[in-house]
Amino acid sequence: MIVLVLDQIPPDDPADDPRPRDAEEPGEGSPVPRPTPRAVVQSFGMLAASVLVGVLAVMPAPYAVNGPGPTRDVLGEVDGEPLIEVEGAPTYPSTGELRLTTISGVGGPGYPAYALNVLRGWISPSSVVRPVEDVYPQDVSREEIDESNAGLMVSSQENATVAALVELGYEVPATLVVAGTVEGTDADGKLEEGDVLTAMDGVALPDYQTLVGRLADVAPGDTVTLTVTRHARSEDVSVVTSEREGGGAQIGVFIDPSFDMPVDVRINIEGIGGPSAGTMFALGLVDLLTPEDEAAGVVIAGTGTIDVTGAVGPIGGIRQKLAGAVRDGAAWFLAPADNCDEVVGHVPDGLRVVEVATLRDAREAMVAIGAGDADDLPTCTAG
């Protein structure tokens, strides 16, 4: 705004000045108008509101507040570098986007929530507020939480790489090292930490997928003979299998596989922890290593853990991730089948959800969506 200031020209003769000589200059010594009661109330109300907001902003509250976090296109770049880098195999461009989704939150060790955060969380339809003890153990530190999340992220990247390469037909050799046994199973006391599984019932175990395939043919209670390398010597150990949670047979050991990757994959991402991006990492790698433009210009978001067999697992914060996806332009969302009960009734306008249980499901959904032939894709339903 431009303000023009006009200088007053003094009269040539004092008599030409119409003001009495003893007249006061405007505003000099004149009485100040008394504020009205309404003005006093309004001023007091504004002051009280400001004080209240200030108090709420610094008053700790025993809650954790989670809302939609940032999304990242796994086919895109981070600081000028591809989010997924591949060496040892050709990669192909894609015109679509595959967005991993996250949640952001305050509350818990190292990041306390304040009353204002909690109030905003209660008001926002896309946020959730829970007692902090329902989210974090009482005796855990922020450093321990961050370390755990970082480890889970690294594990999810390795699982995603193996699952994607196997999906594309690569062989991924693995050394199957026993990390421990399940208490109460027959393997407890028979197998030792550091044992390397090399065969089962005389069939070599060159990779993790072979072990999973062999166990699929075994019923709980069957006896299997495991050939292990222990202290540089080969031994046969007979183990009675037990029932695995979710069905099927298990040996009763924890396996820490060491993979010999046929392709070098590097995932460049910081500031995000946990395992829930695994499915989108795997799907992005599949698309990059496939000549076809499978996403074909569509923005697809999603979430889900993944294991080396390609099984998609449930995650937390699905509703917040749905909100973050539609906020960042996604038209489709790939949701773990085990999260479907939380999805129903909470899908934002403009977003279509596809239920996936495996990496194969996710890949087929991506291809169908990119081809414009997605009408028959399964969606989440109640029950």
Residue spans for each PLM region:
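PDZ/PDZ-like peptide-tail recognition elements
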Residues: 67-94, 101-105, 129-182, 240-304
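Glycine- and Gly-Pro-enriched alpha-helical subdomains that act as flexible
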Residues: 308-335
